[in-house]
Amino acid sequence: MSSIQASRGTRDILPEEIVYWQRVEAMARQILQRAAYQEIRTPMFEQTALFERGIGEATDIVGKEMYTFLDRGERSLTLRPEGTAGVVRALIEHKLFAQGGVQRLWYTGPMFRYERPQAGRQRQFHQLGVEVLGSADPRADAEVIAIATDLLQQLRLTDWTLMLNSVGNQEDRQRYRQALVDYLTPYQAELDPDSQERLHRNPLRILDSKDQRTQEICQQAPQILNYLGETSRQHFDRVQQSLTDLGIPYELNHRLVRGLDYYTHTAFEFQTTELGAQATVCGGGRYDRLVTELGGPDTPAVGWAIGLERLILLLQHQNISYEAKPDFYLVAKGEVAEPQALILAQKLRHHGFVVELDLSGSAFGKQLKRADRSGAPLCLILGDAEAEAQTVQLKWLASGEQEVLSQTDLLDRSNLLRQKIADSYSLKT
């Protein structure tokens, strides 16, 4: 019988990789808590109409990439392709906007899009996102960008660039849309097939085409910054000034429009040159009309989402290592020693140590070889003689230094050992 494998476009995250995910999630949680953001969790599937109204029926996501199905009640449901629409739906449904003030929220979880799988692009992928709802202040745009910058810097990532643009308000976009269509129409036959389809349906997305000839044509296309009204221009100027005040470098990119219809004013991406076609690690912008489009009160908002698979791929590409190693590797052999080793391991864990207990039952020699491979700085050796005397052998694996001490003394010295373990790790880095 043939084995069953993971579906195309999905992948298992194995223990040697999960340490990256845990580090990213822990770092993000710490940064977001310090900025007074609260976590929200929404369902993985929603009514299809939510995404059709929120993202836009003319987008590639809604038109080509959503996983949509009918349930047994003949209701059309869709696995979420992104997180913002669900967050807004939740706030409207639970009347959280009635509380007034500014809502600062963050989320993380799996998203689903039917795309051609490749490195950094899966059909099930994970996003970490933030949303600030209730503030039209340009400082809110700068704040969410600053938080993303903090996360990338805290993770020790380099070689990324913040790309910035404004897509204006609805009136600005309409003027620019017409100017872009007027410019591109004479070149229609030279555009790639996807761009030809988008010309009258969603022309701004043509600016994001990866086709070489289409990119050449777009080089001389009108720039949206020249079509901004005074209000939009002032907003964008203040965002840029705030980023300058914060010391966050950026580049203006007039072709940056993002792929979702709900964006207004500020649009931004954190891009890298190290992941080939999957250059965007984090993307976001302002979406002042989305809440009203989904039936809520007039509420300005801004946010971003990070693709965690791409972020972790970048960490690995830059050889940034996060290793999960035990503090102690506990070796035991003997009828008296083995049950006692389990008790000792639990006591050490209760003292806050990471303890790996060898459960193989193999000879001491084989267990000690596994201890060497574990990466633990300390090995505890417990035979029947030590167990009967309530002692244990403590061995520093790097130096071979070894001593015998009572199990009580071992626990009493926990603070000292914790400091020595920390020192041993710092010496390696």
UniProtKB/Swiss-Prot annotation:
GO terms for molecular function: ATP binding; histidine-tRNA ligase activity. GO terms for biological process: histidyl-tRNA aminoacylation. GO terms for cellular component: cytoplasm. It is found in: Cytoplasm. Keywords: Aminoacyl-tRNA synthetase, ATP-binding, Cytoplasm, Ligase, Nucleotide-binding, Protein biosynthesis. Its EC number is 6.1.1.21. The keyword ATP-binding applies. PROSITE patterns: AA_TRNA_LIGASE_II. Gene3D superfamilies: Anticodon-binding domain, Bira Bifunctional Protein, Domain 2. InterPro entries: aa-tRNA-synth_II, aa-tRNA-synth_II/BPL/LPL, Anticodon-bd, Anticodon-bd_dom_sf, His-tRNA-ligase, HisRS-like_core, HisRS/HisZ, HisRS_anticodon. Its main location: cytoplasm. It comes from the Bacteria. It catalyses: tRNA(His) + L-histidine + ATP = L-histidyl-tRNA(His) + AMP + diphosphate + H(+). It is an enzyme of class 6 (ligase). Belongs to the class-II aminoacyl-tRNA synthetase family. Homodimer. This is Histidine--tRNA ligase. It comes from Cyanothece sp. (strain PCC 7425 / ATCC 29141).
